[in-house]
């Protein structure tokens, strides 16, 4: 990606983050970076791995989780720029696999099955509901117990069940993606430099070895 494209995507992400409360349309975001909707959508998806709309949903969902600790679903919906609590419900289920009511109550009536499994980045703690993944954390062996305790603190009213077999199937689905073009959507948070490095790492072909120097040169910061 050129430095111009990088700057455009960076500006778009900042705009979405600062204006999430009014749910800007694709046209408005594209205008901010001087592009047509069609070309901006393609550029953003190529760089971020998700569409601008989906990225905005991630931001909105995170803020919804914070608001629901002390606000009603109706109040949270309007503050987030959503037209009704039903839209908030659909958003939370789509992104977090839990309803606003379940999040606000700390998981009352919710069953979360969890397990610990080896993954490409070390051991992972995964939690799933009947709707999908609600927790995925990478931990060292020493941190695993603390991770389970943190999951229980986050969902104090939920029923937590250890289910190694059931959660293993989900981990397999997430990480063993062998078909060409298959990918996992990930929302990353970090400094501009960190995002550049992560992007460079993602572009290394499977099975190919590279050096720190090559990565540094690829992002314009030679060692």
Task: Cite the ranges covered by each PLM segment.
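Basic nucleic-acid-binding alpha-helical/helix-turn surface characteristic of O6-alkylguanine DNA
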Residues: 1-80, 86-223
């Amino acid at each position: 990606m050129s430095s111009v494209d990088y700057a455009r995507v960076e500006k778009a992400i900042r705009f979405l983050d600062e204006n999430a409360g009014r749910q800007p349309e694709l046209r408005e975001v594209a205008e901010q970076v001087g592009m047509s909707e069609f070309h901006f959508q393609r550029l953003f998806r190529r760089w971020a791995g998700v569409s601008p709309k989906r990225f905005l949903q991630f931001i909105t969902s995170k803020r919804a989780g914070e608001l629901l600790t002390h606000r009603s679903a109706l109040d949270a919906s309007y503050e987030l720029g959503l037209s009704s609590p039903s839209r908030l419900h659909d958003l939370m289920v789509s992104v977090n696999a839990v309803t606003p009511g379940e999040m606000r109550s700390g998981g009352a009536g919710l069953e979360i099955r969890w397990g610990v499994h080896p993954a490409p980045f070390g051991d992972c703690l995964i939690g799933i509901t009947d709707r999908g993944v609600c927790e995925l954390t990478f931990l060292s062996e020493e941190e695993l117990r603390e991770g389970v305790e943190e999951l229980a603190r986050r969902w104090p009213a939920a029923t937590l069940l250890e289910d190694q077999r059931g959660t293993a199937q989900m981990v397999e689905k997430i990480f063993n993606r062998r078909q060409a073009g298959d990918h996992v959507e990930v929302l990353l948070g970090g400094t501009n430099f960190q995002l550049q490095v992560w992007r460079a790492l993602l572009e290394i072909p499977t099975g190919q070895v590279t050096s720190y120097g090559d990565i540094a040169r690829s992002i314009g910061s030679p060692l």
